[in-house]
């Protein structure tokens, strides 16, 4: 297969690459055959290989970088609250590609970048409230690709998620590999990710010995957390835990504190991002009166992962490995 050896050599032990650009086809993209992909359950045809992709948010941007597609990007938008980007495997991508906005994408900055594809997701850039949607961009002649983790699932007007979160990552890597002519690179990444996760799964506890985990993103009046279709669901399960919100048929959503208390998690995982630091979130949780009887709080079992670890991104396998190592130290009550 084309580029298999190159792709394999570029992969690191974490199945991510630093400084290994994809061997993107150099033929006239305008004359290349159209590519039809299934995206959010719909057949979408792209007439040509995009040259000026604009992305929204860190996980989506790093999917492009992991595929070595920096040269196909016109820029990205994301807040500057995503931690230190100088030590990540895709440092060169961040240095090379223009940071268009520290806010969400808008039609104006997409048009200014002369984008020929927008790669974003529902609540990861796309939003109904001000009309920044794939349909609106289509009217401007700009195609879109929607992050699979964020696909609307039809259970309610805003509920998201149509497949297990890691499967969503593999789907997007495979689809984009096909669109950009880097199928071998995508296949090598997916294979590497699956192997690393399988290695963690093999060490995980089973059955009743699996710690129960609550993902805390933010919120004091009502916590913002992860249901069964958000990336933390599968990150937790592959690491050897059980998401206490597994039965919530949504991706990212709010619940009541009474639900957290009732489900009595053994561990709380904090999503580190935004103006409130992980340490501040931890202090709040450990001192929030309704939680004083919760096992995780009584035993001070709080683990921190970065935002990009917990949204669909090529950092998910590393997050599984780190959380798995922590959960193996937890004695089930």
Where are these regions (language model features)?
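Short helices/loops that flank or line small-molecule/ion binding pockets
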Residues: 106-117, 132-135, 255-264
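Bacterial Sec-exported substrate-binding components of ABC uptake systems
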Residues: 2-12, 16-63, 175-215, 327-333
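Extracytoplasmic ligand-binding site segments that recognize negatively charged/polar headgroups
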Residues: 82-84, 124-132, 142-175, 208-231, ...
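Short helix-initiation/N-cap motifs at beta->coil->alpha
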Residues: 39-41, 97-108, 128, 248-257
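Structured C-terminal subdomain patch of bacterial secreted/periplasmic proteins
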Residues: 163-172, 247-248, 269-333
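Alpha-helical, coiled-coil/dimerization segments enriched in small aliphatic residues
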Residues: 225-252
